């Protein structure tokens, strides 16, 4: 025998099973605690999309204004439930370079896609501006006449848990030709 009788490599009593269950429960709670803050934060953020907005009327008004001001229109498809939509909005409102190009060269419209899969909002606009299947947020750039210049998934603009300001800026610049 390799070990003395007093040394036990495994306990076979019920206390070992209880100990294992407590450890498993503790591990599950730690994982849950790590996941919940991000979900709670996204739900507690202020609404940036307006589900009651008449997007067709707003786009029509933006086209008129864009023609006068010689700017493009940036449609940002997403929803208040979407953490990535809030992250992109945060970048648009906080990064000085991105904020400047948006203010100078674009009119922004946030297009709410709805919260319920069976009851989507603005589905016709999602299809018209070719962002169907992209995931959210998705971008569509219109010229000053309202013609679609490009539709873009924002997945390629991501970096870590947010959007890369340099990639977003490069995308916005390519749409205005500078």
Language model: regions and residue ranges:
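Thiol-based oxidoreductase modules, predominantly thioredoxin-like and allied folds used
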Residues: 98-121
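N-terminal leader/targeting and pre-domain segments
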Residues: 40-69
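N-terminal targeting signals for export/organelle localization
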Residues: 2-51
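Typically the conserved alpha-helix immediately C-terminal to a functionally engaged Cys/Sec
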Residues: 86-101
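Short active-site neighborhood of thiol/selenol oxidoreductases, capturing the structured segment around
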Residues: 69-82
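Solvent-exposed loop/turn segments at secondary-structure junctions
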Residues: 80-84, 91-92, 113-118, 146-148, ...
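Non-catalytic, surface beta->alpha helical segment in thiol-disulfide oxidoreductase systems
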Residues: 134-177
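Structural micro-motif
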Residues: 72, 123-142
């Amino acid at each position: 025998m390799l070990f003395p009788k007093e040394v036990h490599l495994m306990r076979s009593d019920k206390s070992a099973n209880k100990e294992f269950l407590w450890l498993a429960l503790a591990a599950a709670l730690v994982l849950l605690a790590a996941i919940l803050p991000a979900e709670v934060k996204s739900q507690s953020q202020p609404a940036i999309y307006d589900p009651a907005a008449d997007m067709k009327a707003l786009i029509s008004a933006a086209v008129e204004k864009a023609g006068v001001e010689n700017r493009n229109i940036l449609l940002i498809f997403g929803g208040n439930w979407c953490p990535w939509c809030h992250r992109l909005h945060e970048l648009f409102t906080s990064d000085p370079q991105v904020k400047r190009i948006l203010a100078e060269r674009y009119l922004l419209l946030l297009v709410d896609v709805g919260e319920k899969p069976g009851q989507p909002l603005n589905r016709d606009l999602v299809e018209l501006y070719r962002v169907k299947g992209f995931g959210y947020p998705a971008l569509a750039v219109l010229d000053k006449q309202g013609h679609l210049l490009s539709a873009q998934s924002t997945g390629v603009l991501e970096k870590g848990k947010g959007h890369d300001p340099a990639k977003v800026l490069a995308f916005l610049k390519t749409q205005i030709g500078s």
